[in-house]
């Protein structure tokens, strides 16, 4: 609403991110998650995780309190990237068996996983963004070296599009098919950040604490993301918020860890599994920003 004719006031969760804290959530049923599982979900009360080490096919869903086992992936694998919602998700690529890159893609309809068209480039430790089984982006990763490849999914096939400016794996990703962000990754210096506008990647301001193998919110845009945890030199609890132009340090995870997975938005996110660096834990933490009043001056 307008106040005084020139001031716009709004009430929402985005303004509450700087004061939000992480809280303990329900434990996974299956340990051994990460590095990089297929995650999906839009908030702290809506999460999904599939795959994990060693070559797991398990899939679990989160309702804000507890995790429940649902139908497995057709192909067990680790280092897989995924995106979407509890009723419409995608899992692609990965490592199965250890050291063998895969290009297979599976779609989740809310009940079952179905195999579909393969990636053009088999790889692992990539990132993905998107909100359904018909609209996703898959970028970065590792073959026999770190790669910059980016592929776009239209619901039936993958198409090679413009590459990242910096080849990397163990990368954080958030957003949609047309508005995404690629965060950090290996190799050093582990602080690169790029945004995607639907046709090309642009380098933007770096994260404050250089690291890789962290988790990220998955749902949002190139202007709204959360990145947490990671390493080296040791597993960290650092959490940073991206507002579209700069990174801000916010409250840390309760337990520092790397090789963890993330889902949700920058204002309502889940941090799942991970370890310092092993064994992989069953921990879940919830980041839920309080609704707060924000003020913007308009001319």
Identify the role of each PLM range.
Residues 1-299:
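Polar, enzyme-active/binding microenvironments
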